[in-house]
């Protein structure tokens, strides 16, 4: 069983992820806030890794029920120890993890191999202490040597009320796994991270496949509010692009949306722009690096008057100023109105679609009122963007003529 996680998405926006998974692997899924679960055969694992809508991928090693006392910490932690010792069988998941990540080292070292590796571990620790480029989330397992003993860490996440804290559970479970598999504990340069999710009276053990989040792609030159690539893909997917569609991002910032569009929808044409010269230069650099051969064009313009023909655009996907980290809410009240009216002019009636991300709901609703009957809201979805509870509005251009 695989677990695909997107910590930025929740609520109705998760529908897009579910659709993506059904499209990619043709299997049913179970969802919970920020997570989707599905069973997948070995020959479909590559497709899972190709999914553009998810941040992290895990293999679910075991799901076990426990009966915590809820009061006696020592008894509850002992229960965790016993369950890991007697019931947690990770061999199948470990073999899958080794194959997927291409880890060449020793997943099942002998006690002698462990003790020999432990002797050299102090030297390795000294090297880590003097290095200034240690990764915050482990290292790429594929970069290990054939004789390397597996380095690991255990992270515990809890939902519900328990008699113990998450670090205490992680320490107990991690120690038991070390006794069981003879791995080296390493909290910073580990090959494998094991996530133990304790949800009320259930413990779910997961092995991380992605040593870094999949949203870290495409962008080399970041702006103050660069959007995650995974969110960009889901925004684009909500617009249902067709071959030949002209898609614009009028507020492209660092170019995250048009780059993702150019890579994911190569048969569509992407046009993007921004009014800030620095943003245009950043976008140009990122486009040249990430998708130089894609159908992505860039220009500098003002969204108050877009240099585009009437009824010429099929899709608009953009990240509007939030009024928090970029722009001001007082400015948004004017900007949003002018922007929506321009979109009413350039977007094709009846077939045109808009997917707009914003934190400033009030300014957006006022702008919608000003736009009159030019648009119809078909869906409003929630998305967490850097801790801000933003909204995605999916709009359809009506047949009303722009005047």
Roles of regions detected by a PLM:
Residues 1-24, 29-44, 139-140, 159-172, ...:
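Class I S-adenosyl-L-methionine-dependent methyltransferase catalytic core
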Residues 1-187:
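Non-catalytic nucleic-acid substrate-recognition regions in nucleic-acid-modifying enzymes
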């Amino acid at each position: 069983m695989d677990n695909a996680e997107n910590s930025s998405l929740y609520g109705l926006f998760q529908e897009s992820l579910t659709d993506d998974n059904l499209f990619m692997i043709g299997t049913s899924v179970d969802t919970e806030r920020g997570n989707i679960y599905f069973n997948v055969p070995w020959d479909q694992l590559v497709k899972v890794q190709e999914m553009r809508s998810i941040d992290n991928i895990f293999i679910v090693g075991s799901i076990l029920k426990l009966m915590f006392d809820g009061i006696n910490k020592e008894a509850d932690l002992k229960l965790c120890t016993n369950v890991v010792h007697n019931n947690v069988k990770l061999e199948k998941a470990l073999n899958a993890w080794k194959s997927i990540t291409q880890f060449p080292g020793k997943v099942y070292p002998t006690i002698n191999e462990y003790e020999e590796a432990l002797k050299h571990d102090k030297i390795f620790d000294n090297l880590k202490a003097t290095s200034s480029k240690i990764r915050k989330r482990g290292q790429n397992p594929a970069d290990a040597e054939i004789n390397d003993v597996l380095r690991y860490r255990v992270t515990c996440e809890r939902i519900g009320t328990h008699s113990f804290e998450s670090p205490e559970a992680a320490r107990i479970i991690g120690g038991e796994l070390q006794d069981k598999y003879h791995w080296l504990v390493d909290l910073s340069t580990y090959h494998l991270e094991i996530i133990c999710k304790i949800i009320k009276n259930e413990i779910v053990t997961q092995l991380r496949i992605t040593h870094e989040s999949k949203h870290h792609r495409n962008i080399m030159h970041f702006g103050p509010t660069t959007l995650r690539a995974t969110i960009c893909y889901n925004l684009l997917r909500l617009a249902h692009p067709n071959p030949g569609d002209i898609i614009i991002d009028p507020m492209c910032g660092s170019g995250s949306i048009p780059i993702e569009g150019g890579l994911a929808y190569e048969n569509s044409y992407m046009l993007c722009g921004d009014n800030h010269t620095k943003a245009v230069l950043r976008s140009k650099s990122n486009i040249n690096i990430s998708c130089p051969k894609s159908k992505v064009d860039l220009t500098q313009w003002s969204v108050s008057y877009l240099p585009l023909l009437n009824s010429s655009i099929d899709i608009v996907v953009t990240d509007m100023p939030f009024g928090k980290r970029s722009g001001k809410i007082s400015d948004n009240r004017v900007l949003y109105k002018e922007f929506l009216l321009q979109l009413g002019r350039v977007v094709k009636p009846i077939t045109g679609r808009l997917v707009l991300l914003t934190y400033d709901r009030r300014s957006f609703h006022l702008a919608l009122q000003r736009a009159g009957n030019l648009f119809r809201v078909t869906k409003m979805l929630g998305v967490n963007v850097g801790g801000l509870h933003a909204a995605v509005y999916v709009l359809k251009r009506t047949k009303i003529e722009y005047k």
